[in-house]
Amino acid sequence: KAKCAEIDQDCKTSCDCCKGACTCY
């Protein structure tokens, strides 16, 4: 799985990090 560089970013990329949780598509 890919890692997200930052938390709470825009959440419109292939790897979303929102509210402390990351979801990679």
Swiss-Prot record:
Subunit details: Monomer.
Q: Which InterPro entries match?
A: CNTX (IPR035285)
Instruction: Name the lineage.
Output: Eukaryota, Metazoa, Ecdysozoa, Arthropoda, Chelicerata
Key word Disulfide bond present in the record?
A: yes
Similarity section: Belongs to the neurotoxin 03 (Tx2) family. 06 subfamily.
Q: What is this protein called?
A: U11-ctenitoxin-Co1b
| Domain remark from Swiss-Prot or TrEMBL | The presence of a 'disulfide through disulfide knot' structurally defines this protein as a knottin.
Q: Pfam families under this entry?
A: D_CNTX
| One GO cellular component term noted in the UniProt record for this chain | extracellular region
Q: List the disulfide bonds.
A: 4-18, 11-22
